[in-house]
Amino acid sequence: MLYTDGEKVLCFHGPLIYAAKILKAEKWTGEENVTGQVGPHYLVHYDGWKKTWDEWVPETRLLKHNDENLARKATLQEAAKAGSLISSAEKSAASTSAASSLKRAKDSELPDRKSASRGTKRSREHVEAEEEFLKRPEVKISLPDELKLQLVDDWENITKNGQLVPLPRNPCVKDILDDYRKHYLASKRSDPSKQRSPQLVDEVLKGLKLYFDRSLGQNLLYRFERAQYVDYRKKNGPKMGDGDVGNARTANGSMGGEMEPSNVYGAEHLLRLFVTLPMIIVHTSMDAESISLLKEHLAEFLSYIVREKHRLFVREYETASPAYHRISST
């Protein structure tokens, strides 16, 4: 057992890490249990929480209580605060927009009563559409704990250590998606009982590639990486990553195939997409059933990333030169 009774630890609870204490340690052999997993399990008590929150957790949710992991804990909390602010700002902006629409509909008075009726109806429909959007349930994509740690390490390497992901990456995002498709369809041949639809997985992977290519330049880079991105574009293709997920005109392929971000960047940046993906999905017209099916496919894809993480993620980030630091700070 990696942890012992009474040991202070750090434990994942949802997307964040909390200080906790091991109350009891057991090795579970049957899958019929509260976690559905076998192997070492620990009864933990979260510091400062009521005993009703005590729970059994598998070993994968625990971290040693040391300075390195405490830094990870703080980083995740900072990221969560930033995410909450963004979410609140978006909801506030949407609410303000709806309120403004209501006011415009109320204040507008046209001489032609028939035209006024049509205008009021359009305004009312617009407001109702916005209000309906605000009522839509939040889309959550659960990242495996190993990938949460990967995100934290990635953030620290770039923003704290001044390092960069070497470009181009091998495998790149396109390679990863192609490899996953082969793996997904091969699992059907090895287990015919599994329902595997080539058309469905193709749609999911096509969507991931599209979102990645259109989001990379605007949403998936840390500030320190932007100079590298600009330099690579100058040398290899100025249109790389110019797309916008919400812009149908640019979404129809405004850049050359070899210059697409999915041919240049790899798993490190693809993983960041899954942080912003819920906000992208909630802005689509997908119904609840389609979203549920998509989430199932994304969960399976993330499990594949975990299994292949040693092959997919870069082993060593490159240290940026003093000249790069000067450029990136301007």
UniProtKB/Swiss-Prot annotation:
Residues 5-62 form the Tudor-knot domain. Residues 135-329 form the MRG domain. InterPro entries: Chromo-like_dom_sf (IPR016197), Chromo/chromo_shadow_dom (IPR000953), MRG (IPR008676), MRG_C_sf (IPR038217), MRG_dom (IPR026541), MSL3_chromo-like (IPR053820). One of its GO terms (cellular component) is Rpd3S complex. Involved in deacetylation of histones, chromatin assembly and chromosome segregation. May act as a transcriptional oscillator, directing histone deacetylases to specific chromosomal domains. Component of the NuA4 histone acetyltransferase complex which is involved in transcriptional activation of selected genes principally by acetylation of nucleosomal histone H4 and H2A. The NuA4 complex is also involved in DNA repair. Residues 96-129 are annotated as: Disordered. SUPFAM superfamilies: Chromo domain-like (SSF54160). It is found in: Nucleus. GO terms for biological process: DNA repair; DNA replication-dependent chromatin assembly; negative regulation of antisense RNA transcription; nucleosome disassembly; positive regulation of transcription elongation by RNA polymerase II; regulation of DNA-templated DNA replication initiation; regulation of RNA stability; transcription elongation by RNA polymerase II. This is Chromatin modification-related protein EAF3. Residues 104-115 have a biased composition (Basic and acidic residues). The keyword Transcription applies. It comes from Mycosarcoma maydis. One of its GO terms (molecular function) is methylated histone binding. Pfam families: MRG (PF05712), MSL3_chromo-like (PF22732). Its main location: nucleus. Gene3D superfamilies: 2.30.30.140, MRG domain. Keywords: Chromatin regulator, DNA damage, DNA repair, Nucleus, Transcription, Transcription regulation. Component of the NuA4 histone acetyltransferase complex. The gene is EAF3. Disulfide bonds: none annotated. It comes from the Eukaryota. The keyword Transferase does not apply. Belongs to the MRG family.
